[in-house]
Structure formats: structure tokens, C-alpha cells
Amino acid sequence: MSQHQKIYPVQDPEAATARPTAPLVPRGSSRSEHGDPSKVPLNQRPQRFVPLAPPKKRRSCCCRCFCYTFCFLLLLVVAVGASIGILYLVFKPKLPDYSIDRLQLTRFALNQDSSLTTAFNVTITAKNPNEKIGIYYEDGSKITVWYMEHQLSNGSLPKFYQGHENTTVIYVEMTGQTQNASGLRTTLEEQQQRTGNIPLRIRVNQPVRVKFGKLKLFEVRFLVRCGVFVDSLATNNVIKIQSSSCKFRLRL
């Protein structure tokens, strides 16, 4: 009896340990050995994503500096406004009143170089109607007399203090010289013959310091504008003032 030899296949040990060099799924395919990634397994719930609040931005130094400056200025404005309101309620300020009472022309001469020399004496009445406010009239004032666009004379007011509810009469001498005034005298004469009066303007720029009780404030300026109609400009005669009106304005 012949013996049959059985041959069993033997696995190659190198082939058992070798890994495939090619992917199980072709390239470009969305499937792999883990299944379809686009499908969520039935036993796995989808995760909920809670949006996180963005982190707070830190204020820069410039922003803080701007805020502090703005708050300081706001408080300063409120404090100044409150102080002014308190002063107004306590002292009840009233505007001073001014009037031109007398005007005299002492010189009105046309020179050979066509310049006009003039000299005026003006009497001004200043009234302070306030009960608790005094006015210091400081140096550096200026008063001028004008006819249309021509300045005829100029001068200055004296330095003095005007007390409460006080009326002060101020006497001012003014002189001036107008260049190229050959036709100015003729124009004044024609104005007088045509209308019977001559319109003049008197301007006052006066630095003052106001005193509230015992508190003396910083310097401000009184601006006074007076329109005066006179009958003539006769030399060495008191000019008759037909009408006059003055306006007052305060400038810081």
C-alpha cells in the first residue's frame, strides 16, 4: 500500500506581517474602513455647540484719558454755571446806563496839506443802578467821534471807581487830525443845509473790573455806541444835541 504524503500549505511569515501598500478605498472616495463620515451613528447623539461670549476689550490709556478729561470739563462747566447762577440770584446785576449830555467843538480847521484838525469836549453821564455791585474803570480806555467813515477826534476816560447806585459825570477832551479831508468840510456843510442836522457817532471802549460785594472779578470791556444828531459844527460854541441814544455791550 502506497503511502500518500499530505502537503499542507504553510504561510509565509514575511507575507503575514506585511501590510498592504495600497489603500482599501480608492482615492477620492468618502468612505473608509470606519464607514461613511457624513452619517452619524444611531447610537451617538450630535454634540451641541454653545457660542462663547467674546472677551471684553480692555480700554486703552487714550480712551481713559479722554473720558477723564471730558468729565473734568463737564464738572468745570457745571461749577462755573452754578457760580454764575448764585451770583445772579444774590446780587441781581443790572446794566449800567450812559448818555451824552454836552458836546462842544473847540477847533475845526482845514490845514494846507488838506488835513482836518478837530477838538471836542464831551460830557458823559454814567449811571450804576446796582445796589451791591461796584465798577472799577481802569486805564486803557478809548473814546472816538466819527462822521460816517471818518474819525474826527479821539481821547480817553479817566480812571475811577463807581460805587453802588452812583451817578458820575465824566468830562473828556478829545483831539484828532483827519488826512485827505479836503471835501469833508464841504460834505458836512451840505449835510447841515439839506437835513438841518449832522449825524455823529461816539464810540467808547472801556476796560473795567466788576466788584461783587468784596469779590473783585477779572477785567472785561464795556463797549458803548452812541448815535448823536447835532444842529451844526460851529467852532467855540456849544453844539445843540437834537437827539442821542446809546447801546451797551459787554465783551469778555
Swiss-Prot record:
InterPro entries reported in the protein's UniProt record: LEA_2, NDR1-like
Pfam families in the record: LEA_2 (PF03168)
GO cellular component: cytosol; plasma membrane
One GO term of the biological process aspect: defense response to other organism
Residue ranges, annotated region (Disordered): 1-46
Disruption phenotype: No visible phenotype under normal growth conditions, but mutant seeds show decreased sensitivity to abscisic acid (ABA) during germination.
Keyword Amino-acid biosynthesis: no
Keywords from the named record: Abscisic acid signaling pathway, Cell membrane, Cytoplasm, Glycoprotein, Membrane, Stress response, Transmembrane, Transmembrane helix
Segments crossing the lipid bilayer: 70-90
Record localization: Cell membrane; Cytoplasm, Cytosol
UniProt induction comment: Induced by abscisic acid (ABA), osmotic shock and drought stress. Slightly induced by salt stress.
Predominant subcellular localization, coarse grouping: membrane
Function, in words: Plays an important role in the abiotic stresses-induced abscisic acid (ABA) signaling and biosynthesis. Acts as a positive regulator of ABA-mediated seed germination inhibition. Functions downstream of ABF2/AREB1, ABF4/AREB2 and ABF3.
UniProt protein name: NDR1/HIN1-like protein 6
